[in-house]
Design a protein with these regions (language model features):
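Helix-to-loop junctions at the C-terminal end of transmembrane segments
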Residues: 65-79, 281-295
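Glycine-rich segments within core transmembrane alpha-helices of 12-TM secondary carriers
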Residues: 142-164
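Juxtamembrane intracellular "pre-TM" segments in multi-pass secondary transporters
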Residues: 2-10, 201-237
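Structural signature of the two symmetry-related core transmembrane helices
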Residues: 82-97, 297-312
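Helix-loop junctions at membrane interfaces in 12-TM secondary transporters
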Residues: 98-111, 314-326
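Helix-loop boundary and gating motifs at the non-cytosolic
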Residues: 3-60, 232-264, 268-271
Length: 357
């Protein structure tokens, strides 16, 4: 198996670099800005954390309901690119507008919209893996996607960090600094979306029906009825639902949790920057291991590691402990996400990848 990426594989990986800027912002700067907005309007510290977690949970629920429908619709011929581009652009547009709301509630509504659009774009994006590479290359390409996503997102993040941490020395308000950060990351997201949109062609698809929207529900029902015939797929989905929720909870809530404990803001942001840097070689290591080790076994190792990380996080109340958490998460975050994506892509029907993802 050749190691060099094809042009299409590289352009697919570019989207990981683009959208990762948004999710890094969500995990770092965004909770701090929401804390600033809510506290300035009299929201108690413990309520700030609750509202933030409610918003994250609600966005997850919306995606859980809309994702299967949108993914199934994307499997029809020439639908995948259109749906992907729409979701990505809506997410980037919402991100660019984050600085506008002065109300913490309006900000949360916009955040939910952006998070939902981002997550729906990922469903379609992940399903493209079957179109852009071969089965034997899926583990390596998926892992490299996450690896370059982590390191690529560091560029707009560092620039944003300079403005957010030094806005007063630059003679600007925090809101102006945030505006620059949000727009910069939105432009970055769009810029790394366009190469894939330009070159991607849907290789596996289902021929359009007379009423694709209505037939989407019929296909979903038919797939669920065949669950017993696809035990491997649905057993993995059942396990994935639980373990990936734990992974994303740690990613999404780390900064908000640290802020609520009163840990130093600059230290939190730099620690999470370290997570991205550590995740780059760690994800590439998983790509190398996947060539000689069973993918399912590597996923199990990462799950056990995350379980231990979560146990450590329960008692976390010191700055240095947060740094240990950041490094530990970086070691396994990319591996568990990348290999889960590629493993699932291998065991599902190629022409129904959107529906299954």
């Amino acid at each position: 198996m050749k190691n060099k990426l094809t042009k299409l594989e590289f352009k697919w990986i570019c989207y990981d670099m683009g959208n990762s800027a948004f999710i890094l912002l969500v995990a770092t700067i965004l909770p701090i800005y929401f804390n600033y907005l809510s506290s300035s309007q009299g929201v108690a510290e413990h309520n700030y954390l609750s509202y933030w977690s409610y918003a994250a949970s609600l966005s997850t629920l919306i995606v859980a309901l809309a994702g299967p429908i949108l993914g199934t619709l994307a499997d029809y011929k020439d639908h995948k690119k259109k749906i992907f581009l729409t979701c990505a652009m809506l997410g980037a547009l919402a991100l660019a507008c984050f600085w506008i709301p002065s109300s913490w509630f309006a900000f949360l509504v916009l955040f939910i919209a952006a998070k939902v659009a981002y997550s729906l774009s990922l469903i379609v994006y992940d399903s493209m893996l079957t179109d852009i590479t071969t089965e034997e290359r899926m583990d390596a390409v998926s892992s490299k996607g996450y690896a370059w996503g982590y390191i690529g997102s560091v560029v707009p993040f560092i620039i944003s960090l300079v403005f957010v941490l030094m806005y007063d020395k630059m003679g600007m308000t925090l809101k102006t600094a945030m505006m620059i950060a949000f727009i910069l990351n939105a432009v970055w997201w769009i810029a790394f979306t366009l190469p894939l949109v330009k070159s991607y062609k849907q290789k596996y698809y289902i021929e359009p029906e007379a009423h694709p929207a209505l037939d989407t529900f019929a296909r979903l029902k038919d797939t669920l009825m065949k669950a017993k015939e696809q035990k491997k797929v649905f057993l993995f989905l059942f396990a994935f639902f639980f373990y990936i929720d734990g992974v994303y909870t740690i990613i999404d809530m780390a900064t908000a949790y640290g802020t609520s404990l009163g840990l130093n803001t600059t230290g939190l942001l730099l620690a999470l920057l370290l997570t991205q840097i550590v995740a780059f070689p760690a994800s590439l290591t998983f790509a190398v291991l996947s060539k000689t080790k069973d993918t399912a076994s590597l996923i199990k190792v990462a799950i056990i590691a995350y379980f231990l990380i979560a146990l450590f996080a329960v008692q976390l109340d010191k700055q240095w402990e947060f740094w240990i958490l950041a490094v530990a998460v970086g070691c396994f975050q990319g591996g568990i996400q990348a290999l889960s994506r590629s493993y699932f892509a291998k065991i599902i029907p190629e022409n129904a990848s959107g529906e299954y993802f």
